[in-house]
């Protein structure tokens, strides 16, 4: 049994090493190609920036300890979304400029030696998700974004305030950077509608991303978001 445990530990270390350089991502794509054929296979390679592979709690901790700047984090996920979204059609609205401004303010306060900012700095350091970029399902109100739920009659509807879940995450320090596609009125198993079109599966683009939170699932799976807000109407 001791030998088996050692072998399993070695295998685990090998897989972690391969995953850290994106090799497992490519392997999954090659397996998909073998099973389904070359048509529709995702052409975007796995993420190469280390930031994109970090969990939310680690990102927040690194920002607080100044191992990462908040601007670096926001820019990394912005660039990843711009890279993969033309293939996935997962993100249907963004606030990259506003998010960058919020990130710059966080960095300025944390790096400042001004004693007048000590209270604000203390408040920021108490936030568990400080600087973590998040995405939000478009059917969930996020101030300034469309809130159509994929319905043509609501395509010009703009959220005037955040839903409670979005507000709570903002209060915890998270920074919304984009909203994502959903099925029409969140009632279908495929993320497609007549406002934004269909969202594709990151691992096999000829397949669906599921629903109704397929936009969230797709962009998070493609390392374009640390975490996000989805929903399920249940059975």
Regions picked out by a protein language model, each given a short descriptive name:
Residues 1-104, 108:
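An N-terminal boundary/leader segment
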Residues 77, 99, 131, 137, ...:
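Conserved hydrophobic/aromatic pocket- or pore-lining residues that grip, position, or stack substrates
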């Amino acid at each position: 049994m001791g030998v088996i445990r050692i072998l399993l530990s070695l295998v685990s270390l090998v897989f972690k090493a391969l995953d850290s350089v994106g090799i497992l991502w490519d392997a999954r794509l090659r397996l998909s190609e073998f099973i389904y054929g070359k048509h529709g296979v995702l052409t975007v390679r796995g993420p190469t920036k280390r930031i994109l592979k970090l969990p939310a709690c680690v990102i927040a901790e690194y920002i607080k300890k100044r191992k990462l700047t908040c601007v670096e984090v926001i820019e990394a996920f912005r660039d990843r979304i711009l890279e993969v979204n033309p293939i996935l059609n997962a993100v249907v609205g963004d606030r990259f400029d506003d998010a960058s401004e919020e990130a710059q303010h966080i960095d300025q306060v944390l790096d400042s030696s001004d004693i007048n900012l000590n209270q604000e700095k203390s408040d920021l350091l108490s936030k568990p998700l400080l600087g973590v970029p998040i995405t939000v399902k478009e059917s969930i109100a996020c101030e300034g974004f469309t809130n159509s739920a994929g319905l043509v009659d609501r395509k010009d509807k703009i959220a005037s305030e955040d839903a409670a879940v979005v507000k709570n995450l903002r209060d915890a320090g998270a920074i919304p950077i984009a909203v994502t596609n959903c099925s029409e009125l969140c009632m279908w198993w495929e993320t497609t509608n007549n406002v934004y079109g269909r969202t594709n599966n990151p691992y096999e683009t000829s397949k669906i991303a599921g629903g109704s939170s397929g936009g969230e699932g797709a962009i998070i799976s493609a390392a374009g978001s640390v975490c996000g807000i989805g929903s399920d109407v249940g059975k």
